[in-house]
UniProtKB/Swiss-Prot annotation:
Alphabetic keyword roster: Disulfide bond, Glycoprotein, Hemostasis impairing toxin, Secreted, Serine protease homolog, Signal, Toxin
Highest taxon of source: Eukaryota
Domain Peptidase S1, residue spans: 24-250
InterPro entries named in the record: Peptidase_S1_PA, Peptidase_S1_PA_chymotrypsin, Peptidase_S1A, Trypsin_dom
Signal peptide extent: 1-17
Disulphide bond pairs: 30-164, 51-67, 99-257, 143-211, 175-190, 201-226
Compartment annotation: Secreted
Name of the protein in question: Snake venom serine protease homolog rhinocerase 3
Glycan-modified residues: 80, 252
Organism placement in taxonomy: Eukaryota, Metazoa, Chordata, Craniata, Vertebrata
GO molecular function terms noted in the UniProt entry: serine-type endopeptidase activity; toxin activity
Listed Pfam families: Trypsin
One record GO biological process: proteolysis
Amino acid sequence: VLIRVLANLLLLQLSYAQESSELVIGGDECDINEHPFLVALHTARSKRFHCAGTLLNKEWVLTAARCDMENMQIYLGLHNISRPNQDQKRRVPKEKHFCVSSKTYTRWDKDIMLIRLKRPVNDGTHIAPLSLPSNPPSVGSVCRIMGWGSITTTKVTYPDVPHCANIKLFDYSVCRDAYKGLPEKSRTLCAGILEGGIDSCKVDNGGPLICNGQFQGIGSWEGHPCAQPLKPALYTNVFEYTDWIEGIIARNTTVTCPP
């Protein structure tokens, strides 16, 4: 029965891809002006980026809890890692906020980290914030993913520039069918391309999922290898955490994370 259900979903996805010019099979280099809110995270000793994140305002960045690391450095306004933009900035964290310890999140719950920068950044040609969502995401939405993650699945190939692609938002049950052990309910989103070939991948964790123009998800977990058929990725549902995020930013000491 499960195989038949997944096969029907695959046929629906193939039909959708044929009808919608917005869907792509493989990612391409992002336009340099498309991602002023996208940030790159790495350690001072690392030569490659560890994760991505999203600038919410001049002081705050939102990413995944799994992206926590020592000696974190945050790059803003970055496009080509080999040719820095003139307005590119580097910052370090002043504060880190978690729903739970960065060591006890799960792939289906509370994989979220809010970072306050030690020094604010001003808007620029390649630096600008992305607002929190005003509405919850809708199943069937076309969503945009982006990051400096691996662009190949059989071996790790990191690009110098971020790649962007469109994927589709599915009902959470699709990911439950694909990955055994997921709970019946979760504050995560399920998104991808059911025929495979496009997905978030290594180092894209923490980056944004933008659906119908709204920041709806944080890259959390994908199948291994990436971009396999019938294996969508999981994204932390940003809308479910907006009260917590806004409370932390407003310095509300009584705000609590969703149970």
